[in-house]
Design a protein with these regions (language model features):
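Short loop-to-helix capping motifs
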Residues: 2, 24-25, 69-70
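Short, surface-exposed loop/turn segments at secondary-structure junctions
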Residues: 4-5, 46
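Solenoid-repeat scaffolds in large eukaryotic assemblies
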Residues: 6-7, 74
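C-terminal all-alpha effector/ligand-binding and dimerization domain
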Residues: 15, 32, 36-102
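Short, charge-rich, low-complexity alpha-helical interaction segments
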Residues: 25-33
């Protein structure tokens, strides 16, 4: 659990760096208002088997695209990361919801 807390902390710092680099104060304000919910969601998503490695690969792809000043590739990498995180979260939630009896 402590390891996952640290992983979520590092992941949050990575995303905060991206929000700051965007220079979009409105985005930063929205994110700060949602911080607690996002931390919970990140923890659930990153705890899903295989998701941590996928997340690190997605972050690497995003950073490489930004470093190369490749806007289209960065947008694509961000979209893929968000879609994968959403799918993982939905799978995780569906596995933990009580099943309806027929």
């Amino acid at each position: 659990n402590n390891d996952m807390d640290k992983i979520v902390e590092v992941d949050t710092a990575f995303h905060d760096m991206l929000y700051t680099a965007s220079r979009n104060e409105r985005l930063r304000s929205i994110i700060n208002n949602l911080r607690e919910q996002m931390t919970t969601i990140r923890g659930r998503s990153m705890s899903y088997p295989g998701r941590l490695v996928e997340t690190m690969d997605e972050h690497r792809n995003l950073v490489e695209a930004i470093a190369a000043h490749d806007v289209e590739r960065a947008q694509y990498a961000a979209r893929i990361h968000l879609e994968n995180a959403e799918h993982t979260l939905m799978r995780s939630l569906s596995e933990h919801l009580p099943q309806k009896k027929a």
